[in-house]
Amino acid sequence: SFIASQCLAHGELTGFGAFHPDLTPAQAQQALDQIKELGLKGVKLHPDFQKFNIDDRKMYPFYEMIAGKLPVLFHTGDDRYDFSSPTRLARVLSDFPTLTAVAAHFGGYRRWDEAQAVLPKGQVYVDTCSSIAFIGVKRAQELIRHYGADHVLFGTDFPMWDAKDELAYLEEMDLTQEERDLIF
């Protein structure tokens, strides 16, 4: 409810609710109902912290429940683990073509090449958080053009990173005004 209250107080914010992967289907439905009642716009899953594989079959009932209804923001990438690999997300998207997925960190933190190779353009959205400082402005711009600015969302991973820094990276890019408008 904290996130929902902040979104109400600051209309420019879009909030997502959390979801625990070990919920029963009935509990999952109750959690989704609460997320909707709070006015939150989607669900955030962090497989590396929550210790589950994105493509684990135990998650399929949840994906069935949410497909076509709310987007799911997945933490993706990080080569220290395999829970959130872009390849795992690609399998899920193949099985659930109506699932609206946002793959954080340009599709895969520290696994950007893999993400670019396997994630289906046009079906997946990516965000810009916690990436540009590591891959550089030029590579980030290439990824924006690869996925299409209409499938890239501005993200900061605040409070981990300063939003001003994340904005500054995007300001350095050679993007059209239309691309900037789509990202923001």
Describe the function of each predicted region.
Residues S1, F83-T87, K164-L167:
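Short, surface-exposed alpha-helical segments at coil->helix boundaries
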Residues D33, H146-L153, M160-F184:
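Mid-to-C-terminal alpha-helical segments outside catalytic/metal-binding sites
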Residues K41-G42, F52-L153:
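Catalytic pocket-lining loop regions of alpha/beta-barrel enzymes
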Residues I3, I35, V43, I66, ...:
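Conserved, mostly hydrophobic/aromatic
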Residues P47, S130, T156-F158:
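Short secondary-structure boundary segments
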Residues A18, F49, S130, L170, ...:
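Short, flexible active-site loop motifs that bind/organize anionic cofactors or intermediates
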Residues S1-F74, D78-D79, F134:
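Active-site gating/metal-coordination segments in enzymes
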